[in-house]
Every structure is written in C-alpha cells, then in structure tokens.
Amino acid sequence: MIPCRATLSFARCLIRRKVVTLDSLEDSKLCRCLSTMDLIALGVGSTLGAGVYVLAGEVAKADSGPSIVVSFLIAALASVMAGLCYAEFGARVPKTGSAYLYTYVTVGELWAFITGWNLILSYVIGTSSVARAWSGTLDELLNKQIGQFFRTYFKMNYTGLAEYPDFSAVCLILLLAGLLSFGVKESAWVNKVFTAVNILVLLFVMVAGFVKGNVANRKISEEFLKNISASAREPPSENGTSIYGAGGFMPYGFTGTLAGAATCFYAFVGFDCIATTGEEVRNPQKAIPIGIVTSLLVCFMAYFGVSAALTLMMPYYVLDEKSPLPVAFEYVGWGPAKYVVAAGSLCALSTSLLGSMFPLPRILFAMARDGLLFRFLARVSKRQSPVAATLTAGVISAVMAFLFDLKALVDMMSIGTLLAYSLVAACVLILRYQPGLSYEQPKYCPEKEALGSCASAASKSKSQVTVLPEWGFSLRAFFSPSLLPTKQSASLVSFLVGFLAFLILGLSILTTYGVHAIARLEAWSLALLVLFLVLCVAVVLTIWRQPQNQQKVAFMVPFLPFLPAFSILVNIYLMVQLSADTWIRFSIWMALGFLIYFAYGIRHSLEGNSRDEDEDEDTHSNNVHTAAEEKSAIQANDHHQRHLSLPFIFHEKTSEC
C-alpha cells in the first residue's frame, strides 16, 4: 500500500493546479501602467518584424505567385483562431505568465512547466536570431565593413559556432535589456515610436506599389513562361509546365497557395507576448482581447498590402528572395526608395527584438514566483519591473547571439510556440465545459445536495491547489448529456480533448509521411485516413453536445468547440512538419528541463507548499474536535482536495502606478 500511496502522491504533484484568486490579483508587484494602445503597438511590433520585408518575395516566387494574398488570408485565419483562445484566457486570468499560466490553472503543473520551458527556449532563440539579423542589416548598409573587420581579426573556426563573434548584436541586446529593466512604461514608449516608423514605411511601399504597379503581372500566360524557361535553358517541371508554374493568379495551383499559407503562418507569430502583460495593463479584461485581435488584424492588412503591391510592381518569377522590396523599387525606377525600406527594416527588427525580449523575463518571473524555477528570478525593482529575470534573460540571449550560429536552432522556436498554441486551445475547450465557476471558493460542490451545505469546505479564504478531481464518466453523460455541466460531463470532455489531440497527431503523421500512399489509393492508407477523420468528427460532435458553462466574461471564443479544435489541428500538423534533427534538439532541451523540474521545481512549488500547510492545519484541527466534527471535517477537506479549480473571473482593475 505504501508504494501505491507514494505513487499516487507523486502523480498528484504532477497534475496539481494553480488557483488564482482576487487576493492574488491584488497582490501583484508589477507596475500596472500599460494602455490598450500600448498592447496593440507591442503586438504589431512583435509580429510585424523583418519578415514583411523578406517573406512576401520568398513565398510569392517559390510557392504562391500573385495568390500570396490568399496565402496570407488563410494564415491569418488560422492565427486568429489561436489568438481568440489567448484572448479569452487573457480576459479570465489577467496575470503574468501567458500560456504557462493558462496551462497551470487548467491541466496541471507538469504541462505548465513543459509549456513555460519551451517558451523560454523560443524567446531566447528569437531574441538572439533577431539581434544577429539586425546586426547583419546594419552591416549591409555600411557595405559589409563590420563583418569584414571581425572576419579578419576575430574569426572562429569551430563547428556550431558563428563565423565571427557578433559584438553589435550583444550591445543591442544589453541595451534593450537595460531599457526593459528601467521600466515597462519607457519600453512601451520606445516600441510605439519604432512601430509607427515601420507602419509608415509599409504604407509608403503599398502606395508606391499601387502607383507603379501593373495588373498584367498577375495575368502572365503559361506560354510566355515556357518561352522564358526555354530561352534560359531551364528544364520543364515534372508535369510539363514551366518551372515558374502555369501563370495566372495561382501559377502553382491551390496546393502551392496552401503551401505558401503554411509558411506565412509563422509571420503571425508574436501576438502571444500581449498575454504576458496581464499584471501590467490598466484594464486587462478588455485590453488584452482587444490588443490581440486588433494587432493580428493590423498585421494581416500590412502583409496583404505589401504582398499585393510587390506582385503588382514586378512579375513574381523575377522577385528577389532575399531583398524583394529594394529590387522591386529598382525594377520600377525608384532606386533611392531602397534606403527608406532599409530604415523601415531596421525599425521592424528593433520592435521584433523588443517583442521577443519583453515576454521572456515575464515567463521566467512567473515560473520563479510559483517556485518552479529559482526564486531569485522573481525579484522586482523599485520601479516595479522584473529586473532579475530581465537581466538574466538579456545575458543568456547576448551569449547566444555572440557565439552561436543560430540557423540550425531557429526551427526549435516553432515547437515552443505551436505547443503553447495547442495547449491554450485545449485549455479553452476544457474550461468552457466545467461546472459552475465562482469568484473565490470551490466552484462545484457535489456534496451540497447530500449534506445540505458545503460551508465547511468554503470557509477557507485562501487559495488551494487542486489535485486529482474525480475523473470518470457514465454512458448516460455520453449519450444523454444534462442541461447543465456536471462533474461527469466535465470529465468526459477532458478525456475527449486528450483523445482528439491523439487522433489529430495520428492524422497529421499519416498525411505527412503517407501522402504518397494516399495518392496511390492504397487500401491501408485510405482505411486509416477514413478512420481518423470519422473519429475526429465524432469526438468533436460529442464535445459539442455536452453542456457549457454559462458564465460570461469580457471575451469568449465563438463557435465552440469547432474553432479551438481546428486550431489544435493546424498547430499539431505544423509541428509534425518539423525535421527529425529539430525534434532531437528539442528532446535534449526537454531533458535539461525535466532535470531542473524534478530536482528543484517539484519540491519548491508554491502550490505544493501551500497544500502541505493546509494539510497540517487540518490535522491540528481534527485532533481537538469531537468524533462527529472530525468526520465532517474530513469529508469537507476531501471534497476541497477533489474539487476542480478553474480560473476566476476578475473585477476590472484600472488603477495606475
């Protein structure tokens, strides 16, 4: 019995949930000074990085052609699905932590640590790679004099290291780390200036493109493309068409447009940094959803406009993949405009760098405050900024940018981001089908009808960790759900969400690695495809039939459960597309994370310590009560440990520092 009890106790530690109360919201040590406009600027600056100056040309030439505008539309719709899930959690749980916190309060501590640990990796690599890109852009403007100097005197000939140490990237990272340590208000002001310049440059590109553009560039015939290929002595493609496609608006067909959309999806990554500002916004319940949705809309309009202008200015097949906009302006006779584009590119890289550095210390701060990482990272300065986490993040990112060649590591950013998107969407599904939520105390009391009251369970005012709610469901809940959510319906939905993720993973692997078998109509592949599709549809429809919680918050995801389910599908499919080398590196990073968690985090978890204190108090109380009172207290405490805790709905907080 003892080993079984120890195993059960260990399992409870892994799935214990964080409870966020009104008291903990008021206890924030960070400065609440950001406005809705600050969040929009932060989201736009982080998302609308240098990719807008490069990605459009690359995708248009290789995948989509003029239909790149459709690719960006599809990618934007897929990104909005993830954004809406973040927006609902931002309205429900306006605390620092983003996807890490949302996972912690919904599915438990282990998944929360995995999410936070991978977000740390994503932001570190993102910060370092953007800093090196900023340094490279500056070097291009100076005719590559900086790079030539360091190659001559500081060249590094070691596998895995950069060609030369990038002092410019280090100085930039440390400068921004100092700015972020000084205060969030000052950082937001600098971000708004750079974002405004970036938007103005992109507006100039759009206007110039529509003025100098030619609609004929979208109506290029297939015969014309074949003649060009023949004159260049380039062999035709496998289907006999030109290597530049069949011409027209979709030269590579709708499959090419979809392939372009998969690439363009990553252009919208970055809005999640808004969700880390929950304790620094004056009105988080409204500001965070508005900031996320508006920033994605602005970014889509920018990507749509720039890509449309670019494919009007010059034929898609002659676009330059590395510097499409400067080459396009030279093509139409506006060569000096490339300096305007260069200035906008530097501003875009600056805001993108700030957007990567801003959430990183806040994830470190949130995990350290909960005890899952080292406590010194939770120190706050007199200006109410997470200074220890900010400086630590800056030093780590600076070392990465200084020494390493990050090209091989960039794909690892995608794992952390896509995993976070998937978990947040799954958490929204689980959350919305839970029994009634209250503001501070246990939200579901199954003993109420039997005992007449659950006052003894609700008497404690402080937050409690929740472990091992009563799982299990009946066939009646499956085939004939009740009108209101119950413990059984909530357990059923939680199980089905996990099963749906498993089915989507299998479907993604099949359509990725068995696509040729499906194309050849092989029986086994078609049978598996039909099985996965039927089961996915059945699971989603079963979830749809379950009763939802009717409590309202400032923002709620529409079209439940279809929208979050489709978001999970998109994210898992994109994760499966990553290379085996990327997953091997990811496994090494996760092994390091599990070492830290099981050696330090699981023993220092604030939620675990709170639970131990509560158990000690209950033991002392039980020793001094009568036998009848002792029995009643044990029953109440048993319920308190079993009830399913979920995020609270907070009153709006609008006070300013």
Swiss-Prot record:
Reaction(s) catalysed by this chain's protein: L-arginine(in) = L-arginine(out); L-lysine(in) = L-lysine(out); L-ornithine(in) = L-ornithine(out); L-homoarginine(in) = L-homoarginine(out)
GO cellular component labels: plasma membrane
Single GO MF descriptor: L-arginine transmembrane transporter activity
GO terms (BP aspect): L-arginine import across plasma membrane; L-arginine transmembrane transport; L-ornithine transmembrane transport
Extracellular side: 60-66, 126-163, 214-248, 311-339, 407-409, 511-523, 576-581
Membrane protein topology class: Multi-pass membrane protein
Segments traversing the membrane: 39-59, 67-87, 105-125, 164-184, 193-213, 249-269, 290-310, 340-360, 386-406, 410-430, 490-510, 524-544, 555-575, 582-602
Major localization listed first in the record, in broad terms: membrane
Residue numbers bearing the Phosphoserine modification: S24, S463, S645
Gene3D superfamilies: Amino acid/polyamine transporter I
Topology feature Cytoplasmic, residues: 1-38, 88-104, 185-192, 270-289, 361-385, 431-489, 545-554, 603-657
Glycan-carrying positions: N157, N227, N239
Lineage top rank: taxon: Eukaryota
Keyword terms of this UniProt record: Amino-acid transport, Cell membrane, Glycoprotein, Membrane, Phosphoprotein, Transmembrane, Transmembrane helix, Transport
The keyword Transport appears for this protein: yes
Compartment(s): Cell membrane
NCBIfam families: 2A0303
UniProt similarity note: Belongs to the amino acid-polyamine-organocation (APC) superfamily. Cationic amino acid transporter (CAT) (TC 2.A.3.3) family.
Free-text function comment from the UniProt entry: Functions as a permease involved in the transport of the cationic amino acids (L-arginine, L-lysine, L-ornithine and L-homoarginine). May play a role in classical or alternative activation of macrophages via its role in arginine transport.
Name by which UniProt lists this protein: Cationic amino acid transporter 2
Species for this entry: Sus scrofa (Pig)
Lineage: Eukaryota, Metazoa, Chordata, Craniata, Vertebrata
Gene: SLC7A2
